[in-house]
């Protein structure tokens, strides 16, 4: 049986919010079967819980934010991407502010935290969502789609007219597995352009961003001294974001995601369209040991080896 997983131990971290620039305390805790990923604002009295659910997305302005009334938790996508990558089904995410800390701008620090906490198999089958019929959403020339597929595949194309971003590094595809995620996707950092800095400042955005936690480009080149972690790091980060956004379905996907210039808003629109068309998907479990699992999850302790 492919089982649900939670954390073995409680683990804590501290970081800075991408948009707020505030210091944030983060605590990841185990949760019972069928809990899902629940975000808990511990700085409020009483505390407020917000489930990691596509229907709870309230804002997608340069990050995905979950909302309940006027309470929100923003920039959830990198942590959710790590949860999806390692196959964590159930966890409580306690946070001391309205934003998950940015860490180094990738999902890698969250992968390390989850690996350090350890994963524990639970006595219940893991539920997947299998795409049965194609679903597509468009916005101008942008699109995002889900199609039936035997595993979980992601294909993404960006379109930046920039000297440092060649045509050959604007598209990528991955067949998802824990190993692929950790080695090929998790280290890709968020990025921004100097020309957008004024807009960010005027709108109180990206106050926590710097070259320690983001790729920064001027009109000609990458400004970070160490350069890029992958030649196509920008499009890989878009895949990382998409994995996190898609995990707001509450379950791992069996299907193929394709996107052109998509972002958090279009990803969420895609999930809502899928959920609305109930004939386009189904829940599946793998209880028979003889069944081949469509997605390969590796015990996190051995992933980095």
Swiss-Prot record:
Transmembrane segments: none annotated. The active site is at residue 264. Keywords: Hydrolase, Lipid A biosynthesis, Lipid biosynthesis, Lipid metabolism, Metal-binding, Zinc. It comes from the Bacteria. InterPro entries: Ribosomal_Su5_D2-typ_SF (IPR020568), UDP-acyl_GlcNac_deAcase (IPR004463), UDP-acyl_GlcNac_deAcase_C (IPR011334), UDP-acyl_N-AcGlcN_deAcase_N (IPR015870). Zn(2+) binds at residues 78, 237, 241. Its EC number is 3.5.1.108. Its cofactor is Zn(2+). GO terms for biological process: lipid A biosynthetic process. It is an enzyme of class 3 (hydrolase). The keyword Lipid biosynthesis applies. SUPFAM superfamilies: Ribosomal protein S5 domain 2-like. It catalyses: a UDP-3-O-[(3R)-3-hydroxyacyl]-N-acetyl-alpha-D-glucosamine + H2O = a UDP-3-O-[(3R)-3-hydroxyacyl]-alpha-D-glucosamine + acetate. GO terms for cellular component: membrane. Pathway: Glycolipid biosynthesis; lipid IV(A) biosynthesis; lipid IV(A) from (3R)-3-hydroxytetradecanoyl-[acyl-carrier-protein] and UDP-N-acetyl-alpha-D-glucosamine: step 2/6. Belongs to the LpxC family. HAMAP family: LpxC. Catalyzes the hydrolysis of UDP-3-O-myristoyl-N-acetylglucosamine to form UDP-3-O-myristoylglucosamine and acetate, the committed step in lipid A biosynthesis. This is UDP-3-O-acyl-N-acetylglucosamine deacetylase. The gene is lpxC.
């Amino acid at each position: 049986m492919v089982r649900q997983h939670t954390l073995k131990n409680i683990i804590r971290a501290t970081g800075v919010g991408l948009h707020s620039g505030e210091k944030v305390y983060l605590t990841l805790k185990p949760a019972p079967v069928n809990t899902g990923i629940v975000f808990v604002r511990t700085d409020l009295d009483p505390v407020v819980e917000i489930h990691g659910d596509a229907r709870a997305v309230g804002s997608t302005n340069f990050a995905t934010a979950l909302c309940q009334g006027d309470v929100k938790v923003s920039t959830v996508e990198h942590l959710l991407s790590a949860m999806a990558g390692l196959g964590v089904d159930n966890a409580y995410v306690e946070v001391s502010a309205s934003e998950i800390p940015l860490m180094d701008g990738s999902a890698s620090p969250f992968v390390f935290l989850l690996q350090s906490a350890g994963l524990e198999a639970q006595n219940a089958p893991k539920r997947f969502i299998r795409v049965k019929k194609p679903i597509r959403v468009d916005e101008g020339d942008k699109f995002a789609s889900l199609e039936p597929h035997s595993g979980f595949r992601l294909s993404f194309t960006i379109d930046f007219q920039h000297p440092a971003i060649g045509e050959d590094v604007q598209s990528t595809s991955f067949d998802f597995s824990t190993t692929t995620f950790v080695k090929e996707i998790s280290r890709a950092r968020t990025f921004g352009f100097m020309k957008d800095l004024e807009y960010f400042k005027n709108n109180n955005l990206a106050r926590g961003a710097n070259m320690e936690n983001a790729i920064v480009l001027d009109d000609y080149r990458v400004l970070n001294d160490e350069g890029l972690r992958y030649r196509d790091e920008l499009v890989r980060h878009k895949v990382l974001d998409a994995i996190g956004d898609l995990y707001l379905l509450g379950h791992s996907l069996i299907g193929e995601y394709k996107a052109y210039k998509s972002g958090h808003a279009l990803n969420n629109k895609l999930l809502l369209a899928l959920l609305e068309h109930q004939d386009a998907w189904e829940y599946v479990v793998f209880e028979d040991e003889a069944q081949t699992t469509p997605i390969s999850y590796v015990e996190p302790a051995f992933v980095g080896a």
